[in-house]
Regions:
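Charged docking surfaces used in two-component/phosphorelay signaling
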Residues: 18-26
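Conserved acidic carboxylate
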Residues: 11, 35
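Acidic catalytic/metal-coordinating carboxylates
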Residues: 36, 62-65
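Active-site beta3 strand of CheY-like receiver
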Residues: 47-53, 58
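Short amphipathic alpha-helix used as the core "switch/output" element in two-component signaling
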Residues: 64-75
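C-terminal output helix
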Residues: 106-115
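The feature encodes the CheY-like receiver
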Residues: 59, 86
Length: 123
């Protein structure tokens, strides 16, 4: 069995956040779900996070700007989630510090496939 990942989920849509959290927890991961970028920026445990899974369309800041601000404080594997999947959107995610761009809606298996290749940062 693989080592559980510590995942910070940044998603303002409550139903989506709950669905993703339940799936990830069922897969054995530890999930902390927060609704906005300001809450993410205020966390003092970013160095202990293995994965940041963030929506791009947050209410207070777009996910690209958020990742630029978070990246100096964490080496976590970062996955952008967006309804936009054009080449320009994907390139913007990568340029902002994300390692992967997941297009919504997605099936849970697609997320687990990405996570399968992520190594825990500090176990």
């Amino acid at each position: 069995m693989r080592t559980p990942l510590r995942i910070l989920l940044i998603e303002n849509h409550e139903v989506t956040a709950k669905f993703i959290s339940l799936f990830l927890e069922r897969e054995g991961h530890q999930v902390t779900a927060i609704p906005d970028g300001q809450t993410a920026l205020g966390r003092n445990d970013l160095g202990n996070i293995d994965v940041i899974l963030s929506d791009i369309g947050l209410p207070d800041v777009n996910g690209w700007e958020l990742m630029k601000q978070l990246r100096p404080h964490t080496r976590a594997y970062a996955i952008a989630m967006s309804g936009f999947g054009g080449e320009a959107d994907i390139q913007r995610s990568l340029a902002s510090g994300y390692q992967y761009h997941l297009v919504k809606p997605f099936v849970p298996a697609a997320l687990e496939e990405v996570l399968r290749n992520v190594e825990p940062a500090h176990h």
